[in-house]
Amino acid sequence: MMTLIMLISLITSFIFMQMKHPLAMGLMLLIQTFLTSLLTGMFVKTFWFSYVLFLIFMGGMLVLFIYVTSLSSNEMFSLSMKLFFLSLSMILMFIVFSFFFDKSIISMFINNNEMNNLFSTNSLMMEDLISLNKMYNFPTNLITLLLINYLFLTLLVTVKITKKNYGPLRPMN
């Protein structure tokens, strides 16, 4: 599963370099962020960090989407056959490579006892529970409460500013 996600991530990276339309580039960045979040969640065995990472990237992408749509709203979008054949050939090369690749080399890395001890599920689950407890226990719960209050205050100020102008912050010409 992880190799498939890494393959798709590699293909979207190559496709991103060939894109010319800003909205298509934003879509590729969004797909890349989703795949990175999936990989991060698989490594850590909990999706806390990957969920926060995805939300932060989504917030940034929404701001970029607003800027891009206001700047290049009437630009035409066309699909390139060169890009399609490039991605198709990369997928076929990966399939052929996976059929002819020596499986014993892969099993040597997977069946390593040191790696199994390092990434045992019990130690990772206990580590995740301890790290979640640390966030809400005494020394760090003050920082969490401060962050919650700061975000709430920012929300109130933003609502007050937009209510005062009765519309968007940017004047329309």
From Swiss-Prot:
**Record field: transmembrane:** 24-44, 47-67, 81-101, 142-162
Q: Which reaction does it catalyse?
A: a ubiquinone + NADH + 5 H(+)(in) = a ubiquinol + NAD(+) + 4 H(+)(out)
Q: What is the predominant subcellular site recorded for this chain?
A: mitochondrion
Q: Which GO terms describe its cellular component?
A: mitochondrial membrane
Alphabetical UniProt keywords: Electron transport, Membrane, Mitochondrion, NAD, Respiratory chain, Translocase, Transmembrane, Transmembrane helix, Transport, Ubiquinone
Per the UniProt entry, the Enzyme Commission number(s) are 7.1.1.2
Under Gene Ontology molecular function, one entry of this record is: NADH dehydrogenase (ubiquinone) activity
**What membrane topology is given?**
Multi-pass membrane protein
| Superkingdom classification of source | Eukaryota
Subcellular compartments: Mitochondrion membrane
Broad class of enzyme this protein falls into: translocase
Q: What does this protein do?
A: Core subunit of the mitochondrial membrane respiratory chain NADH dehydrogenase (Complex I) that is believed to belong to the minimal assembly required for catalysis. Complex I functions in the transfer of electrons from NADH to the respiratory chain. The immediate electron acceptor for the enzyme is believed to be ubiquinone.
Annotated protein name in UniProt = NADH-ubiquinone oxidoreductase chain 6
Q: What is the lineage of its organism?
A: Eukaryota, Metazoa, Ecdysozoa, Arthropoda, Hexapoda
Could you tell me the gene encoding this protein?
A: mt:ND6
